[in-house]
Amino acid sequence: MVFLPDNILILGHGGFGFNTNVFETNIINLAAVVGIVVSFVGKNLSSLLEDRKNTIVKNLEEANQRAIEAEQKLTAARTQLETAKKKAQEIREEGVLRATQEINNVVSQHELRLARLQEFKQETLAFYQQKAFKQAYLYVINKIMTRVRERLNKGLDSTYHVVVNNFYVSRFTQF
């Protein structure tokens, strides 16, 4: 082996030269390695990249589908909320209506009871008034009857005899 001043190593006659210049050698070696890697690994790498691309596209489509489903569910939930609000408003209005009807019903029943109570009061007053008149009438009649008996028991004098006779005569003339 002979070393030449140009940094070329010659192996035998017409042999193979090896460049020992580091920068030039590294660039050549790097190009050779990249060429080998691209030729052998390129198909596999492009296949891996295509698979990854398909996976990403599939994930994006699934995410888009989930977003659409979520939007539909949100729309359905909003619709249900509006329906529930309407139903609650109807129930509230019905409750107010029923409460008003119940209040009116109670007021009318109360007025009927008051009217019956007033009627009962008037009947009671009339009854006690009749009772008082009857008692007064009986008292007056009893007093009159007592005085008549006393007069009859004492005997009639001429003035009373004339009054009694006139009474009977007036009664007979009325018939």
Swiss-Prot record:
Note: In plastids the F-type ATPase is also known as CF(1)CF(0).
Name the record gives this protein: ATP synthase subunit b, chloroplastic
Residue ranges that the Swiss-Prot or TrEMBL entry lists as coiled coil: none
Domain of life where this protein originates: Eukaryota
GO CC terms, sorted: chloroplast thylakoid membrane; proton-transporting ATP synthase complex
Matching Pfam families: ATP-synt_B (PF00430)
Function according to Swiss-Prot or TrEMBL: F(1)F(0) ATP synthase produces ATP from ADP in the presence of a proton or sodium gradient. F-type ATPases consist of two structural domains, F(1) containing the extramembraneous catalytic core and F(0) containing the membrane proton channel, linked together by a central stalk and a peripheral stalk. During catalysis, ATP synthesis in the catalytic domain of F(1) is coupled via a rotary mechanism of the central stalk subunits to proton translocation. Component of the F(0) channel, it forms part of the peripheral stalk, linking F(1) to F(0).
Localization terms from the record: Plastid, Chloroplast thylakoid membrane
PANTHER family named among the record's database cross-references: ATP SYNTHASE SUBUNIT B, CHLOROPLASTIC
Source organism (scientific name): Chlamydomonas reinhardtii (Chlamydomonas smithii)
Topology term for the membrane: Single-pass membrane protein
Signal peptide: none
